Curated annotation (Swiss-Prot):
It catalyses: tRNA(Gly) + glycine + ATP = glycyl-tRNA(Gly) + AMP + diphosphate. SUPFAM superfamilies: HD-domain/PDEase-like. Tetramer of two alpha and two beta subunits. One of its GO terms (cellular component) is cytosol. Its main location: cytoplasm. GO terms for molecular function: arginine-tRNA ligase activity; ATP binding; glycine-tRNA ligase activity. GO terms for biological process: arginyl-tRNA aminoacylation; glycyl-tRNA aminoacylation. Belongs to the class-II aminoacyl-tRNA synthetase family. It comes from Pseudomonas putida (strain W619). It is an enzyme of class 6 (ligase). Its EC number is 6.1.1.14. This is Glycine--tRNA ligase beta subunit. Keywords: Aminoacyl-tRNA synthetase, ATP-binding, Cytoplasm, Ligase, Nucleotide-binding, Protein biosynthesis. NCBIfam families: glyS (TIGR00211).
Length: 683
C-alpha cells in the first residue's frame, strides 16, 4: 500500500503561552487516535507549536484505508426456520444487519451475515480526524470572533493541509485548507508556500519562523547560557519560564540588558520575582549566588539595532525595580514585630480567629517542640511570634511570593538572631514535593508547628479534604511534617505535640477524638510515600499496626522490615506469626505473661523456649537503640526451632495448664517480633 507524508497546520492569533506545549501534544494525540481508529498506519510523527500556529506532521501515512470483511453469526438454522418459514429470530437478525433475509448466508449451522467493506481514501477521512482532534483540545474556555459561530482558544487565521504534495480540500474552523502558511510578522510578512509536508520546517525557517518548540527551547537555553558566561555569571533558567518564553517567540534572539546597581540593596528574591514573573527575563547570578545587575531578555526579532531593544527593556523594568525598592525601604521604617498589630484584623479562618491568633499558637507550639528535637525553645517561640508579620508588609502585598523571604530580611535588619530570621522563611518549607527542607532546628520547629496548627484547626472544624479538593493544602502540610522529621532525622513523638496543638484551640474546635484523627491522617500519607519508593503496602501496614508516634521511628521500622523481607527465613516466619496470631486470638481468657517450663512435655518446647530467651536477651539492647534491622536479622534464627515446635507439638493440648503454657510461649514469640512490626501481615 502506498504512503505519503501528511501535514496539518492551523494558524491563529497568539496562543496562550503557558498552554502552548500542552495544546500541541494534545493535537498530535488526537490525530493519532483518529488515524488508529481508521486503521491507517504511519511510520513517524512530529508536533510543532509556535505562538501563532499548531502543526502535526505524520510521516508515510497510508493513502488508503484497508478493505475490511465482517462476519456476524446469527441464530441456529433450527431456530431460524419453522416449517420452512422464517421465524422472528431470523427476521430480527436480518433487520439488525440492515439487509433482506435472502442476503443472509444459510449454508452453515447458523445464519451468517458477511460483508466486504472497501477502504476509503485517506484524504476523505482526514478532515473529520483533524476537526475531532481540535474539538478535543484541553481548552478551558473557548472564544468566538467576528460573525463566526466557530469556537476555539484564539481566532483562526489560516489552514494548511497537505497529503503528499496535494491539498486536502476542506474547511475547518472557518478556514479553507490550502498550502499557504505565514512567516514572521516583521521579517517575512508575506505568505509562505509549503511545498511538501517534509519541507515544512525549512520553508518556515526561510521565513524566520522556527516551528519546532523543542528547537526554539534548546536555542534559547544554549544562547542564554553562553551570554551569561560572557557576563561572568550563571543564568537562572526555571523550566517553566523557559517553556513560557519559548512559547512567546517564533525567532528567538536573546540579548543582555542591565539595571542600576543601587537596586541590589533590595532583597534579590524580590528583584528576581518581578523580572521573571512580570517581564519573563532570565536573571544572572555571580559565582557566590548573588544577583548581578544584568539580565537576559529574548526578543522575537533580529533587529538591525539591538541596542534599541535593550534600551526599551531596561526602561520597562526600571519602574518595577523602583517599586520593589520603595516597598523595601518603607517596610524597614518600623520593626517587623509591629506588623503583628495589622494581623489582628486579618482573618485566618472565620471559626479559628485571626492570623495573629495563629502566630501566637505557632509560637507556643514551636517553643514546645524545639527542645524535643534539640533546638532552643526561646528562639523557636520568638520566630513563631514573628512568623506571619511580613504578610502585612508592603513588599509581600506587592509580591506574595516573598512571604517568609521578606520576613527574613526584615528580621536581620532588626537585629534578630540568624536562626530566628531564617526560620521566618523556613516555616514554609518544604514548598513542594522534593523541595528544600529547613536547615535550622528553629526553622524546623516553626515549620512543624505551623503545619500541625493548620491540620488541627481545619480538622477541628470539620473541613476535611475530599477527593481533589484540599483548599488548605492539608495533605501537603502532613507530608511536609513527615519529610522534615524523617529526612532531618528528628525524633519527635507527634502524639503529645498534636495534643498540645488541640488544647490551644480550646472551645473553637471539637476536641474529642481530634488528635487521633489528625495523627491518622498524617501517618496515612506515608503509605503513598513508601509506594513511590517501591516499598510494598504490606510492609507499611505491618508497622502501622503498632501505631508508632514518631515518624522517624516509623521509617526506621519500615526500612528494617523491608530488609527483613529479603532474608530466606522471612516468608516462613511471617506465615508462622500469622498462625500464632490466629491461635492467640482464639485463646480463652487472659494469656499468662510467664512461661512455666515444668509444663513442657516435649523437647521441642524446651528448644523453642531456650531460643526465645536467648533472642530476647540479644534484641533488647538492639530495640532500645532502635537497631531494628539487626533485631529482625537476629530473630530470623528462630525459624528452625519454631518449625520444629509446630511439627512436634499440639498447641491445643487437652490439659488446660499445658495448653495455657503453650499459649504463653507463643505469646512471648510473637511479642519479640511485635517489638519491630506485625510481620504476620506480610504473608
Amino acid at each position: 500500500m502506498s504512503a505519503q507524508d501528511f501535514l496539518v497546520e492551523l494558524g491563529t492569533e497568539e496562543l496562550p503561552p503557558k498552554a502552548l506545549a500542552t495544546l500541541g501534544d494534545a493535537f498530535l494525540a488526537g490525530i493519532e487516535k483518529g488515524l488508529q481508529a481508521a486503521g491507517l498506519n504511519y511510520t513517524g510523527k512530529q508536533v510543532y507549536a509556535a505562538p501563532r500556529r499548531l502543526a502535526v506532521l505524520i510521516r508515510q501515512l497510508d493513502v488508503q484505508q484497508p478493505d475490511r470483511s465482517i462476519n456476524i453469526d446469527g441464530p441456529p438454522l433450527q431456530a431460524a426456520f419453522k416449517d420452512g418459514e422464517p421465524t422472528q429470530a431470523a427476521l430480527g437478525f436480518a433487520k439488525k444487519c440492515g439487509v433482506e433475509l435472502s442476503e443472509i448466508d444459510q449454508s452453515g449451522a447458523k445464519l451468517r451475515f458477511s460483508q466486504h467493506i472497501p477502504g476509503k481514501a485517506t484524504a476523505s477521512l482526514l478532515p473529520t480526524i483533524v476537526e475531532d482532534s481540535l474539538n478535543d483540545l484541553p481548552i478551558p474556555k473557548r472564544m468566538r470572533w467576528a460573525a463566526s459561530r466557530e469556537e476555539f482558544v484564539r481566532p483562526t487565521q489560516w489552514l494548511v493541509m497537505l497529503l503528499g504534495d496535494q491539498v486536502v480540500d476542506c474547511t475547518i474552523l472557518s478556514q479553507q485548507a490550502g498550502r499557504e502558511s505565514r512567516g514572521h510578522r516583521f521579517h517575512h510578512p508575506q505568505n509562505v508556500v509549503i511545498t511538501t509536508p517534509a519541507n515544512y520546517v525549512e520553508d518556515l525557517r526561510k521565513a524566520y519562523v522556527l516551528a519546532d518548540f523543542a528547537e526554539r527551547r534548546e536555542l534559547i537555553a544554549k544562547r542564554t547560557t553562553e551570554l551569561a558566561m560572557q557576563q561572568e555569571g550563571t543564568a537562572i533558567v526555571p523550566p517553566a519560564l523557559l517553556d513560557e518564553v519559548t512559547a512567546l517567540v517564533e525567532w528567538p534572539v536573546p540579548l543582555v540588558c542591565s539595571f542600576e546597581e543601587r537596586f541590589l540593596e533590595v532583597p534579590q528574591e524580590a528583584l528576581i520575582t518581578t523580572m521573571q514573573d512580570n517581564q519573563k527575563y532570565f536573571c544572572l547570578l555571580d559565582s557566590e549566588g548573588k544577583l548581578l545587575p544584568r539580565f537576559i531578555t529574548v526578543a522575537n526579532v533580529e533587529s538591525r539595532d539591538p541596542k534599541q531593544i535593550v534600551s526599551g527593556n531596561e526602561k520597562v523594568v526600571r519602574p518595577r525595580l523602583t517599586d520593589a525598592e520603595f516597598f523595601f525601604k518603607q517596610d524597614k521604617k518600623q520593626p517587623l514585630e509591629t506588623f503583628n498589630e495589622r494581623l489582628k484584623n486579618v482573618v485566618f479562618q472565620a471559626q479559628l480567629g485571626t492570623v495573629y491568633d495563629k502566630a501566637e499558637r505557632v509560637s507556643r507550639l514551636a517553643a514546645y517542640i524545639a527542645p524535643l528535637i534539640g533546638g532552643d525553645a526561646q528562639r523557636a517561640g520568638r520566630a513563631g511570634l514573628l512568623s506571619k508579620c511580613d504578610l502585612a508588609t508592603e513588599m509581600v502585598g506587592e509580591f506574595p511570593e516573598m512571604q517568609g523571604v521578606a520576613g527574613y530580611y526584615y528580621a536581620l535588619n532588626d537585629g534578630e538572631p540568624q536562626d530566628v530570621a531564617l526560620a521566618l522563611n523556613e516555616q514554609y518549607m518544604p514548598r513542594g514535593a522534593g523541595a528544600e527542607l529547613p536547615q535550622t532546628l528553629t526553622g524546623a520547629a516553626v515549620a512543624i508547628a505551623d503545619k500541625l496548627d493548620t491540620l488541627v484547626g481545619i480538622f477541628g472544624i470539620g473541613m476535611l479534604p475530599t477527593g481533589s479538593k484540599d483548599p488548605y493544602a492539608l495533605r501537603r502540610a502532613a507530608l511536609g511534617v513527615l519529610r522534615i522529621l524523617i529526612e532531618k532525622q528528628l525524633d519527635l513523638d507527634l502524639t503529645p505535640a498534636v495534643e498540645f496543638a488541640v488544647k490551644q484551640f480550646g472551645a473553637k474546635v471539637k476536641a474529642a477524638g481530634l488528635a487521633e484523627q489528625v495523627l491518622e491522617f498524617i501517618f496515612d500519607r506515608l503509605r503513598a510515600r513508601y509506594e513511590d519508593e517501591g516499598i510494598d503496602v504490606a510492609t507499611y501496614l505491618s508497622v502501622r499496626a503498632l501505631k508508632p508516634g514518631s515518624a522517624l521511628d516509623f521509617d526506621q521500622r519500615v526500612q528494617a522490615v523491608q530488609a527483613f523481607r529479603k532474608l530466606p527465613e522471612a516468608e516462613a516466619l511471617a506465615a508462622v506469626n500469622k498462625r500464632v496470631s490466629n491461635l492467640l486470638s482464639k485463646a480463652e481468657g487472659a494469656i499468662a505473661e510467664q512461661v512455666e517450663p515444668k509444663y513442657f512435655d516435649n523437647a521441642n518446647e524446651f528448644s523453642l523456649y531456650s531460643a526465645i530467651q536467648q533472642a530476647d536477651q540479644a534484641v533488647q539492647p538492639m530495640a532500645a537503640a532502635r537497631q531494628y534491622s539487626e533485631s529482625l536479622a537476629r530473630l530470623a534464627a528462630l525459624r528452625d526451632p519454631v518449625d520444629a515446635f509446630f511439627e512436634a507439638v499440639m498447641v491445643n493440648a487437652e490439659d488446660a495448664k499445658v495448653r495455657a503454657n503453650r499459649y504463653a510461649l507463643l505469646s512471648r514469640l510473637r511479642g519479640l517480633f511485635l517489638g519491630v512490626a506485625d510481620i504476620s501481615l506480610l504473608g
